[in-house]
Amino acid sequence: MRSIRSFANDDRHVMVKHSTIYPSPEELEAVQNMVSTVECALKHVSDWLDETNKGTKTEGETEVKKDEAGENYSKDQGGRTLCGVMRIGLVAKGLLIKDDMDLELVLMCKDKPTETLLNTVKDNLPIQIQKLTEEKYQVEQCVNEASIIIRNTKEPTLTLKVILTSPLIRDELEKKDGENVSMKDPPDLLDRQKCLNALASLRHAKWFQARANGLKSCVIVLRILRDLCNRVPTWAPLKGWPLELICEKSIGTCNRPLGAGEALRRVMECLASGILLPGGPGLHDPCERDPTDALSYMTIQQKEDITHSAQHALRLSAFGQIYKVLEMDPLPSSKPFQKYSWSVTDKEGAGSSALKRPFEDGLGDDKDPNKKMKRNLRKILDSKAIDLMNALMRLNQIRPGLQYKLLSQSGPVHAPVFTMSVDVDGTTYEASGPSKKTAKLHVAVKVLQAMGYPTGFDADIECMSSDEKSDNESKNETVSSNSSNNTGNSTTETSSTLEVRTQGPILTASGKNPVMELNEKRRGLKYELISETGGSHDKRFVMEVEVDGQKFRGAGPNKKVAKASAALAALEKLFSGPNAANNKKKKIIPQAKGVVNTAVSAAVQAVRGRGRGTLTRGAFVGATAAPGYIAPGYGTPYGYSTAAPAYGLPKRMVLLPVMKFPTYPVPHYSFF
């Protein structure tokens, strides 16, 4: 199933199509005026009939209830010949569309409607209408349809049908055989089936208002499909009550509200699945007491044609061609492709322009906070007209063709330190960094500083490799110039506050992370956030750490940089220069437990030598081997032992005597 967002294009097409078929405000106002006028006129006709029958004027009697659509009217209404008038069909359901505005009302009678009553109402209705409005209406009777037809004489042309019926007609059909019949029907009784259909339409209107009106997009989809039934003859048999049932079942069974495009697609999926075909579930009519198939009037060929057409429409929708189903022109994209020219002019005056797509085109509705931060940063930089070039790019623009050389590579594998150099006008500049790219960037910063160019935070945008990005908490850290060999340029505030701004990670002179190196010397240190200032795009954090009773502060654009700055300040104050020897922490060798305690202690003392404080990373002495396991080097199968490594011994590796312990015999099984 497509994602929710993928239906946005379908929603746009459906809503545009709906706006073209929805009646205009003038048409809706004309419908409301005509229906209200006829309803009020029929009420006056009812009053006139009661006066004629009783011979007295009864204007204070109960008015006709318009909103009640009940068929089981009580016997106390026996004084009125006309019990009430109700709206049915498109007027009651709100499904009117252009060029298809059939207006219908039901006039409920106390007794079974006759031709005589129809003529009486038809003759008196124009008189009552003239009392209510100056507009001219044509009133005709249609005995075959058991109705009165009313037409207006001005644009828009509207036709209103008033159908006469009575609850007694349905009650009589439900009586069982053998029950007494109250009286014989009059000879001029109107068509019984037409009256029954009017009662069914009344039930349909009540059901629709209760079940379908509250469903999101249901009424919109019904208007779209009614227009489809008018345009495509294949769909014409489905128009009316069956279409309303299918839409309500298709949309109402979803566990969430649907947009117009997705709701239309769901209805098409339901029809394309073959529910109309013979052998299918059929379409139950909920407004009938007995089980009734609402599709019983359709032929097998009609059902197959509608199913085939729905499958074709579903394929078109799946391939983004719903406009063909709606018979409309495709709409342009909601995000038009535009080309912008970003020109970069160098100092020599040569300019170059490149056509690129707008920055916002690739964003869409992505909720990634990093992308949102990048978008905000781009807007800020564009507004300030800042040239997006780091120090290396700027130096290459000023002095093209410079050759960078790798002087040395030191440090452990997990934290290497590269030293790069460049020769500018006979002067050699050197700088270090965790990668060649960062070292070159630091060299460029030094050269620009020597040449007098600004290299502040706002101008130098961070350019780091993917390995360095993984070490940062935020992808948008932007810090400016300083390298490990240029720590003297860092600024120190009151209370030993140090703010270091570098192109890459903050490192000590030995190429380590300041926080890690300080943790090796003093464990259990706690860093506290002192302050947080600046806007969302230019934050400044101040962190504080207490070491040996002294507090050191560091500042940076994020907490990690501020923490490293504080640690670097502590290292420079306490563990550099003459303070290094006094503050060096003695390391204690943990006493080994078990049988090997004495032997291990002796071995450690033997290899310690000239004041070596402790063992380096290396040898591990295990405890006594557990029963059932073979200790390395003692009775090991296949001749393996704890001999020296195949590639020789490391220079600083500590060798310990191998302790041999007796173990339980382990049986060896042979399967050959």
UniProtKB/Swiss-Prot annotation:
Biased composition (Basic and acidic residues): 357-371, 466-476
The protein's name: Spermatid perinuclear RNA-binding protein
Domain annotation DRBM: ranges: 387-453, 510-576
Keyword entries, A-Z: Cytoplasm, Developmental protein, Differentiation, DNA-binding, Methylation, Repeat, RNA-binding, Spermatogenesis
Primary residence: cytoplasm
Subunit structure: Interacts with EIF2AK2. Associates with microtubules; it is unsure whether such interaction is direct or indirect.
Biological process according to GO: cell motility; mechanosensory behavior; spermatid development
Protein encoded by which gene: STRBP
Signal sequence residues: none
Keyword Nucleotidyltransferase in record: no
GO cellular component terms, A-Z: cytoplasm; manchette; nucleus
Pfam family, one: DZF_C
Modified residues (Asymmetric dimethylarginine): 612, 617
Chain spans, region Disordered: 52-73, 349-371, 466-499
Cell compartments where the protein resides: Cytoplasm
Cited function: Involved in spermatogenesis and sperm function. Plays a role in regulation of cell growth. Binds to double-stranded DNA and RNA. Binds most efficiently to poly(I:C) RNA than to poly(dI:dC) DNA. Binds also to single-stranded poly(G) RNA. Binds non-specifically to the mRNA PRM1 3'-UTR and adenovirus VA RNA.
Biased composition (Low complexity): 477-497
Keyword Cytoplasm: yes
GO molecular function, one term: RNA binding
